[in-house]
From Swiss-Prot:
Name of this protein: Serine/threonine-protein phosphatase 2A 56 kDa regulatory subunit epsilon isoform
Chain segments carrying region Disordered: 1-39
In-chain residues carrying the UniProt-annotated modification Phosphoserine: 30, 32, 34
A Pfam family assignment: B56
Localization per record: Cytoplasm
Gene giving rise to this polypeptide: Ppp2r5e
Keyword Cytoplasm attributed: yes
InterPro entries attached to this UniProt entry: ARM-like, ARM-type_fold, PP2A_B56
Function as written in the Swiss-Prot or TrEMBL entry: The B regulatory subunit might modulate substrate selectivity and catalytic activity, and might also direct the localization of the catalytic enzyme to a particular subcellular compartment. Interacts with cyclin G in vitro.
Family label: Belongs to the phosphatase 2A regulatory subunit B56 family.
Quaternary data: PP2A consists of a common heterodimeric core enzyme, composed of a 36 kDa catalytic subunit (subunit C) and a 65 kDa constant regulatory subunit (PR65 or subunit A), that associates with a variety of regulatory subunits. Proteins that associate with the core dimer include three families of regulatory subunits B (the R2/B/PR55/B55, R3/B''/PR72/PR130/PR59 and R5/B'/B56 families), the 48 kDa variable regulatory subunit, viral proteins, and cell signaling molecules. Interacts with SGO1. Found in a complex with at least ARL2, PPP2CB; PPP2R1A, PPP2R2A, PPP2R5E and TBCD.
GO cellular component: cytoplasm; cytosol; protein phosphatase type 2A complex
Organism: Mus musculus (Mouse)
């Protein structure tokens, strides 16, 4: 645990990215400890009796003493130091977890500050610097926290504390405040996925228990995402924060507040632009769909936002966008579908025409979705003209036989939906193609005449043929 900064952090804004300026190239390590303060000598803890071995009347005082003992931090990077005391603290933490789970009347008003102090001493620390240019979260193994044998039990204890039937938010709010939440959110940048998973549960419990902190938590998550999108593109806990948001959005009251709608359009939609989208796309798509199920009128700005940020050069991201778009179409209201069908299917037509077969294949799979097919059938007079030329051309020219087979199935479906328009479009397409071929032939003949004329002029100029 690092020493406190000279200037206390503002509670108006969380900075989960302050470490970026001090990130340096480093050798990859499998473990790191970010909380040890050098003691200079071996640590000695006075062994205390087990809680179950003392009379019930003495247990509250002993509980407080054990909480105070567990504030001592050990160096886990030195695997040979303080082995006995490390094991003693581990067993004490285990005992505290069991005690708070099964005992009744253990959460007196005096225990709240000691619990929060013990948790704070153990989990709040400066995270080890990470060079985002060298570390690829999709390829590299994360840096695991060496002190996890203790840290895990501290998190487990804190969760049991928050979930206890005796827990009183009215007392706890004196100690679990905005400053505590800020420090908790900074820890979401931990590279250790085990820690982020526990943090997710802790923050979710705090959001549920402390009504007065809810708006503040949403605001700080908003700040983290904005910094992530527009400045750093580095934050390890985006997926976990989005998972929490999915539950929060699900609980929003109707009608939605303007701030919630703004968060969707100004924060969640731009999250699609970052390079590491694949790490949290499933959670992001879930949040988007939750918003649309709450308020279908948001469908149009969401679809237009996705069209605006549609990937131009990354086929993998295109496939993800298409998957998310299908999730949206699964819950779209027919009245909303009509508003966005033209720009939507112009984009789908481009995807179907993609030389990358996975993009084309994912777009063509829309026609296997019964609900989407029903929407297409109801609006075939608009959608068929948009899609037809791309589909017909692909059926003749695409390099991948699997794509050609899928296109034939789509064309067959369109023909069954609206045979009259299909025949008209076929005739028009063939007529246009013949005109294009005729123009192309005329263009070639014109160029040939011009080349011949230029050749003759050159020969006359050189006196090879008489003028």
């Amino acid at each position: 645990m690092s020493s406190a900064p000279t200037t206390p952090p503002s509670v108006d804004k969380v900075d989960g990215f302050s470490r970026k300026s001090v990130r340096k190239a480093r050798q990859k390590r499998s473990q790191s400890s970010s909380q040890f303060r050098s003691q200079g000598k071996p640590i000695e803890l006075t062994p205390l009796p087990l809680l179950k071995d003392v009379p019930t009347s003495e247990q509250p005082e002993l509980f407080l003493k054990k909480l105070q003992q567990c504030c001592v931090i050990f160096d886990f990077m030195d695997t040979l130091s303080d082995l006995k005391m490390k094991e003693y603290k581990r067993s004490t933490l285990n005992e505290l977890v069991d005690y708070i789970t099964i005992s009744r009347g253990c959460l007196t008003e005096q225990t709240y500050p000691e619990v929060v102090r013990m948790v704070s001493c153990n989990i709040f620390r400066t995270l080890p610097p990470s060079d985002s240019n060298e570390f690829d979260p999709e390829e590299d193994e994360p840096t695991l926290e060496a002190s996890w044998p203790h840290l895990q039990l501290v998190y487990e204890f804190f969760i049991r504390f928050l979930e206890s039937q005796e827990f009183q938010p009215s007392i706890a709010k004196k100690y679990i405040d905005q400053k505590f939440v800020l420090q908790l959110l900074e820890l979401f940048d931990s590279e250790d996925p085990r820690e982020r998973d526990y943090l997710k549960t802790v923050l979710h419990r705090i959001y549920g228990k402390f009504l007065g902190l809810r708006a503040f938590i949403r605001k700080q998550i908003n700040n983290i995402f904005l910094r992530f999108v527009y400045e750093t593109e580095h934050f390890n806990g985006v997926a976990e924060l989005l998972e929490i948001l999915g539950s929060i959005i699900n609980g929003f009251a109707l009608p939605l507040k303007a701030e919630h709608k703004q968060f969707l359009v100004k924060v969640l939609i731009p999250l699609h632009t970052v390079r590491s989208l694949s790490l949290f796309h499933a959670q992001l798509a879930y949040c988007i769909v939750q918003f649309l199920e709450k308020d279908p009128s948001l469908t149009e700005p969401v679809i237009r936002g996705l069209m605006k940020f549609w990937p131009k050069t990354c086929s993998q991201k295109e496939v993800m966008f298409l998957g998310e778009l299908e999730e949206i179409l699964d819950v779209i209201e027919p009245s909303q579908f009509v508003k966005i069908q033209e720009p939507l299917f112009k984009q789908i037509a481009k995807c179907v025409s993609s030389p990358h077969f996975q993009v084309a294949e994912r777009a063509l799979y829309y026609w296997n979705n019964e609900y989407i097919m029903s929407l297409i059938e109801e609006n075939s007079n608009v959608i068929l003209p948009i899609m037809f030329s791309s589909l017909y051309r692909i059926s003749k020219e695409h390099w991948n036989p699997a794509i050609v087979a899928l296109v034939y199935n789509v064309l067959k479906a369109f023909m069954e939906m609206n045979s009259t328009m299909f025949d008209e479009l076929t005739a028009t397409y063939k007529s246009d193609r013949q005109r294009e071929k005729k123009k192309e032939k005329e263009r070639e003949e014109l160029w040939k005449k011009l080349e011949d004329l230029e050749l003759k002029r050159g020969l006359r100029r050189d006196g090879i043929i008489p003028t």
